[in-house]
A protein has these predicted regions:
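Solvent-exposed loop/turn segments connecting transmembrane beta-strands
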Residues: 46-55, 77-88, 113-125, 148-157, ...
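Transmembrane beta-barrel strands of outer-membrane/channel proteins
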Residues: 35-41, 63, 73-75, 107-111, ...
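Flexible, solvent-exposed coil segments and beta strand-coil junctions
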Residues: 38-41, 70-75, 108-112, 136-143, ...
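Bacterial Sec-dependent N-terminal signal peptides
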Residues: 1-26, 269-271, 275-279
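Residues on the lipid-exposed face of transmembrane beta-strands in outer-membrane beta-barrel proteins
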Residues: 37-39, 59-65, 92-96, 129-137, ...
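Outer-membrane beta-barrel transmembrane domain signature
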Residues: 149-266, 270, 277-279
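Short loop/turn motifs that connect adjacent beta-strands in outer-membrane beta-barrel proteins
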Residues: 24-31, 99-105, 139, 167-178, ...
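Short glycine/proline- and aromatic-enriched beta-strand/turn motifs that initiate or cap beta-hairpins
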Residues: 24-78
């Protein structure tokens, strides 16, 4: 759910304002239930895509047990020339988020339940856990995070970013938050490398030959750069979010004559649209 986590700082800023208002006359906190509908114009995983230019719809249910602890679940429906609103699986998350005036800290554990027939680029992912830290100030917010991804192998990832939050109050007692941001993503990549090695066990009458060797390789590389600008409008219990983004995948894995083992990706614009209601 990378798209969801990108605007955590801006959404957390709004949560801080709403929480302060809601608790101004009471010290008790009640669980909050939230429902949202999200639409992604181009599903991707660090800029990696399928060959069908798929878009996705994922309704999300969130239960905030306290202002800091939450659980959520989001079924994912995929649209492309071959599929129309096809169910691909569900992603569930449990997490902790502490929003302060200077620091935002977050810890989460995500468990996907993808269909075996899912064509999503990230469908091999079995679980993911991560932490993030944001330092807020008036000039620029500094974001850093790390994660561990579990599939048939274990991969490690890091995120670094900068953003600047602009808050505008509207005449109808709403608020608009604009959060231009830039991010860099890095992580381990696992792939096979094939090369030829001289065979030194030849005899006098038989020439030495080359032996083909295939080995597993793991490298830590930059995965993508991204510029994004979440625009959030909130009034009362309603929140509307539009997040245009431009992502540039890096270090795509390519295997000669094996498109099934190669990564597909390109620099591209995409957007995530969200409508959320808090009960």
């Amino acid at each position: 759910m990378k798209q969801y986590k990108k605007f955590v700082a801006a959404a957390a800023f709004l949560m801080l304002l709403q929480s302060a208002h809601a608790q101004s006359d009471s010290t008790k906190t009640k669980p909050q239930f939230k429902l949202s509908v999200n639409y992604n114009t181009r599903l991707n995983y660090y800029g990696r895509t399928d060959s069908l230019r798929s878009s996705g719809v994922f309704p999300m249910a969130e239960l905030w047990l306290t202002p800091k602890f939450y659980v959520n679940a989001a079924p994912i429906f995929v649209n492309n020339p071959l599929q129309s609103f096809d169910y691909a699986g569900t992603v569930a998350t449990v997490g902790y988020q502490n929003v302060g005036t200077k620091w935002i800290t977050s810890v989460y554990l995500t468990k996907p339940f993808y269909k075996e027939s899912s064509e999503l680029v990230q469908s091999a992912l079995q679980a993911q856990s991560g932490v993030s830290l944001t330092y807020q100030n008036k000039i620029v917010n500094i974001n850093a995070g790390g994660d561990v991804k579990f599939s048939d192998k274990v991969d490690y990832g890091t995120t670094a970013g900068l953003d600047h939050i602009v808050r505008i109050e509207t005449k109808n007692k709403g608020v608009v938050v604009i959060d231009p941001s830039v991010y860099a993503y890095a992580g381990t990549q696992n792939f096979q490398r094939t090369y030829y090695k001289k065979n030194n066990s030849g005899f006098l009458l038989f020439p030495r030959n080359n032996q083909q060797v295939t080995e597993e390789v793991s490298r830590f590389n930059v995965l993508a750069y991204e510029a994004t600008m979440p625009i959030i409008y909130a009034k009362g219990k309603v929140m509307l979010i539009a997040t245009p983004s431009y992502i540039m995948p890096q270090n795509l894995i390519t295997v000669p004559n094996r498109p099934d083992l190669s990564e597909r990706g390109e620099n591209m614009f995409y957007a995530t649209l969200t409508a959320k209601y808090t009960f």
